[in-house]
Regions:
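Phosphate-handling DNA/RNA-contact segment within nucleic-acid enzymes
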Residues: 1-3, 15, 36-40
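Short active-site oxyanion
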Residues: 1-5, 48-51
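Short, flexible loop segments at the rims of nucleotide/cofactor-binding pockets, characterized by
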Residues: 2-3, 27-32
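Well-ordered beta-strand positions
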Residues: 5, 23-24
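Charged, low-complexity surface patches
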Residues: 6-7, 56
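Short, polar loop motifs at secondary-structure junctions
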Residues: 10-13
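TOPRIM fold recognition
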Residues: 19, 23, 31, 35-178
């Protein structure tokens, strides 16, 4: 598993990266990078580091600059226009898994053991799934931990992939229960 969180532009890019590597991925949704997304990227940078992999075009470079300006110290992975070209379209979503792996290796990504600190029983115990207010509780805990909102399965993945400690998790739950 790649240690750093990979930041891409959109959902199709997420799919392409997931075909290539096991990693936590944030999709910024194009130019509409809002404060919530930037804060998730900042938190990811603090916890594991971030690698930005955007399309090899003007829009991709602009998004890369916006993120770089707001989140210092991130790494950058690049694909060429030729590597990302298919049927008249240029983008990460068109790159082969081999090209994406090579780009991440050039960005000096780190490999780590997949972590399983948390499981579904933790979410059930803390009423983050299987409870009428589970969605609101996950949203609040996600905000406290800087991992954002997600469904139960994705929330569990983020807890494990972002390196959240059990102590941090319990403290976040306590803060929302006040």
């Amino acid at each position: 598993m790649i240690k750093e969180v990979i930041v891409v532009e959109g959902r199709d890019d997420v799919t392409a990266v997931k075909r290539a590597v096991d990693a936590e991925i944030i999709a910024v949704g194009g130019f509409g990078i809002n404060a919530k997304v930037i804060n998730r990227i900042k938190e990811a940078q603090k916890r594991q580091g971030v690698i930005v992999l955007t399309d090899p075009d003007h829009a991709g470079e602009k998004i890369r600059r916006i993120i770089s300006k707001r989140v210092p110290g991130i790494k950058h992975a690049y694909i060429t226009q030729k590597e990302g070209f298919k049927d008249g379209d240029i983008g990460v979503e068109n790159a082969s898994p081999e090209v994406i792996i090579k780009a991440l290796e050039c960005a000096k990504c780190e490999i780590k053991e997949k972590r399983q600190e948390f499981d579904i029983q933790d979410l059930i115990y803390f009423k983050l799934t299987g409870d009428i207010k589970a969605k609101e509780r996950r949203e609040a805990v996600g905000r406290e931990l800087g991992v954002g909102y997600s469904n139960s399965n994705q929330f569990l993945t983020r807890l494990n992939n972002y390196g959240i400690t059990r102590e941090e998790f319990i403290e976040a739950v306590k803060r929302i229960d006040v």
